[in-house]
Amino acid sequence: RDYYASRGLGDVYKRQVRFCDRQLGRVLDLMDELDLWKDTMLIVNTDHGFFLSEHGYWGKGGSPNYEELVHTPLFIWDPRSGRKGVHSPALVQTIDLAPTVLDYFGIEIPADMLGRPLTQTLADDTPVREYALFGYHSMPVGITDGRYTLLRDVKDFDEKTYEYTQMPTHMRAMFSVEEMRTATMAPGFSYTKGTPVMKIEARPNPRFLHTLKGGDMLFDLQNDPHQEHVLEDAEQSDRLLTAMTAAFEENDAPEEMYSRYGLSSTGRRRNK
């Protein structure tokens, strides 16, 4: 903490926020200048949050997925409803953005998309989901209903995980030769439209694997919005674990992921 604080990371972050604020202001000014509000949808969103010493962390990665990381800003202007200055209680995710844009332009939403169009939510707060699943590949996984959040730790670190892909590239590099030597062909998933995929042994960064230090974490966001106290409530934990299993099935998660997180598949998978 002292390392980052002494280097003024907080000040750098503030300057970046001011810069983004100015650039967003330019967009809003242009919307005014060209009178675009009457027929243009505007979406402002971020991909993830950033720790500035909260919970003892800086940046992101290697920490539990607290609200500071996963509860991101989302502002949407929809000229059809014309609602403004309203904070909606609806639980939504970034996967809802693409269906929302498609629906705005009257384009059919593909059956493979799990996101929901937010058209009615933007009009009158109609909910689109009961739960939201979130996390990083092979690391602790979270689920929330908007009030209670459960962070599920990895239960079987010996269970291998795989990357399923038709394009073997990481974010900043191609897959290595060593990784490609583990590749086999798999039949694919419900969303690959009947096409096979490469199944490549994943090699997660070990510093990300033990973020919960061996235990699940349940929080009541209504009474503990800063997630300072782990809640002991078996009923809520069981309910959220059931919802997590259902979300795994909806996402057509591979079988090894159930073992990794100590979940029992009911066999209700999406049709391929």
Put a short name on every predicted segment.
Residues E67, H137-E232, R270-K272:
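C-terminal, low-complexity/hydrophilic appendages and adjacent surface loops
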Residues R129-L133, E255-G262:
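WW-domain-binding short linear motifs
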Residues H71, D96, T100-Y104, P117, ...:
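Generic recognition of well-ordered alpha-helical segments
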Residues V17-C20, L24-V27, M41-T46, P73-I76, ...:
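Beta-strand elements within well-structured catalytic alpha/beta cores of enzymes
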Residues K38-T40, G85-D145, H229:
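Polar, surface-exposed loop/tail segments
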Residues L30-Q93:
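Histidine-centered active-site microenvironments of extracellular/periplasmic hydrolases
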Residues S6, S88-L91, I95, L212-G215:
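Short, solvent-exposed loop/helix junctions and linker helices
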Residues D2-Y13:
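Single conserved hydrophobic/aromatic residue that forms the stacking wall/gate
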